[in-house]
Amino acid sequence: MLRINDDDHPNEKIGFISAIKGDFHDLSSDYLKRIAAMAFPIMKEHGFGVTSLDEVAYNAKFWGRNWNKGECIELVLRDASNRWLPFEFVMDVFLHELCHIWQGPHDRRFFSHLSTLRAALIALYAKGYKGPGKYMTWDSFVLANVVGNYNTVVFNGITLERSTMHGVETCGGSLQRKKKIRRKPTPSSTKKRKLTRTGQKLGTDMNIRLELLKSPAKPQAQSMRGREARIAAALLRVDNSNEYKPKDHNSSTTLENYFVVE
């Protein structure tokens, strides 16, 4: 994402950074920016992109969550007692969520790739890297002394194992939108009304049908009797009179004056 005259943004691979509104908003926002800055080389190397990096409140279910493969990554920055979580731990959770962009389920491939990301992070720690530009130092980072103890033993530091703390799982899962199921198109209400209207049925007068068919038996479609019956019915329909008049066989208009078109 191209940003013009935006020196405050720490990571061009992340579109937006949002902290919870309240008394700790500025501190949380700065914390998230430090996380984003630290992850920039790794995200650039592996082609990761995140639309929005958001802070979420403490909960007993997860420390981080990935929505729709990087559309939004949520991180918990404070524990149940409102204490700030160590930078290493939050960074490790962020790598975990970034890995979900590449692989959804927690399988062997996922943890193998996560180990690669963690190794890259350890290499950055060894170089003293903290971020690009003004984020290269923590002189202006208010929480530096609170969250910046590298290799914190009590929180397991950076390891190649799945991290947990206070019995809370690291990840809340990789969540994706459900695909919309296309339903078969249904007729409009107007068309349905048209289909349900009762029309005038043809051939309801059994006396006329018997006279035309010359037999109560139903004729075959391709039989001579069926063809003659269809011709007789056509002649009857073009008759201007509403009442049926028996045919005058002496009249010039007879079946012999017509032929069947195959």
Swiss-Prot record:
Residues 178-199 are annotated as: Disordered. Zn(2+) binds at residues 96, 100, 106. GO terms for biological process: DNA repair; protein-DNA covalent cross-linking repair; proteolysis; translesion synthesis. Transmembrane segments: none annotated. The active site is at residue 97. Pfam families: WLM (PF08325). Coiled coil: none annotated. Residues 178-196 have a biased composition (Basic residues). GO terms for molecular function: metalloendopeptidase activity; metallopeptidase activity; zinc ion binding. It comes from the Eukaryota. Residues 8-195 form the WLM domain. Its cofactor is Zn(2+). It is found in: Nucleus. GO terms for cellular component: nucleus. Keywords: DNA damage, Hydrolase, Metal-binding, Metalloprotease, Nucleus, Protease, Zinc. Its EC number is 3.4.24.-. A motif (SUMO interaction motif (SIM)) lies at residues 235-242. InterPro entries: WLM_dom, WSS1-like_metalloprotease. Belongs to the peptidase M3 family. WSS1-like metalloprotease (WLM) subfamily. The SUMO interaction motif (SIM) is important for binding to pmt3/smt3 (SUMO). Metalloendopeptidase that acts selectively on DNA-binding proteins. DNA is needed to bring the protease and substrates together to enable proteolysis. Involved in the repair of toxic DNA-protein cross-links (DPCs) such as covalently trapped topoisomerase 1 (top1) adducts on DNA lesions or DPCs induced by reactive compounds such as formaldehyde. Involved in DNA damage response and processing of stalled or collapsed replication forks by removing the covalently trapped top1 from chromatin. DPC proteolysis enables the repair of the lesions via downstream DNA repair pathways. Binds to DNA. Interacts with pmt3/smt3. This is DNA-dependent metalloprotease WSS1 homolog. It comes from Schizosaccharomyces pombe (strain 972 / ATCC 24843) (Fission yeast).
